[in-house]
């Protein structure tokens, strides 16, 4: 049995620094209005595990059966991102996974003009608000829905944290049949 099984396990921890990124906290006194310089200041940690199992057996002289499976878990985190001095801690990216999903928290739908008039002003979102539109939560309590009301919706993003697969290959003489199934988990997609 052990001559027919091949198992591979890898752990990885990758710490990258001096990543090229656009400066966001550059003082305006230096004359960079709206266009800040690029600099090698970013820092990211990427870590996880990979497991692969392969079983191969020859049955008689004409049949070969091969079964394989794999599993990968990956997690990353910004250790340092040059960010502006945000007024609220929930707006920062440092210490969070890459490409987290941020957005507004929906409180339901507006049902009347009176409800719209008594809700936080959403006009900065660019639409003429009418009954039936989504009403968003005023996170910072300033009476207006702005980019400062965006929060972390999920630490998952469109890049899956878990990937897996199962495969089977059967060969008889010079004819072979193979099938492979793969999937992913721990991801979110905004639609």
Task: Go through each PLM region and give its residues.
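Active-site proximal loops enriched in glycine and acidic residues that flank catalytic Cys/His/Asp
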Residues: 10-13, 55, 149, 179-185
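Conserved small-residue
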Residues: 56-158, 189
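Generic alpha-helix detector with strongest preference for long hydrophobic helices that associate
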Residues: 32-34, 50, 149, 156, ...
